[in-house]
């Protein structure tokens, strides 16, 4: 990462619009699972070559944003969400939750691998 920029982990979670914390219905799970490949396609189109993405669960993608600020990471997340809804109007009833955290490293972790 550049001197004034860091790496951020971005977690995007698809949720059914009616989701209130109780058990998710089979219909909602079906909609979420069908939407995930479309979100993956949006991610491919939206991320830089140095960014890494992986499916984290049936309803989540985790993205490592390199050389980024918090504000830049939020811009990326909102751009992805806007593009997803623009290209996939059928899934507008699904919500996408954003979680973003700065990647933290400590001397102990680094020293373990550097001798």
Where are these regions (language model features)?
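Short, internal active-site loops enriched in acidic
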Residues: 14-20, 59-60, 102-106
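Catalytic strand-loop-helix junctions within cyclic-nucleotide turnover domains
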Residues: 25, 64-73, 88-115
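Conserved catalytic/dimerization core of cyclic nucleotide/dinucleotide signaling enzymes
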Residues: 21-36, 53, 72
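Short amphipathic alpha-helices in soluble, non-transmembrane regions
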Residues: 39, 76-83
């Amino acid at each position: 990462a550049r001197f004034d920029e860091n790496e951020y982990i971005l977690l995007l979670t698809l949720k059914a619009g009616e989701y209130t914390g109780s058990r998710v219905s089979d219909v909602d799970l079906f909609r979420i699972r069908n939407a995930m490949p479309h979100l993956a396609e949006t991610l491919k189109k939206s991320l830089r070559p140095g960014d890494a993405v992986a499916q984290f669960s049936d309803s989540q993608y985790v993205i490592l944003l390199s050389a980024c600020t918090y504000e830049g990471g939020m811009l990326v997340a909102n751009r992805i969400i806007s593009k997803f809804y623009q290209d996939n109007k059928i899934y507008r009833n699904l919500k996408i939750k954003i979680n973003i955290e700065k990647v933290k490293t400590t001397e102990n972790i680094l020293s373990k691998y550097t001798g």
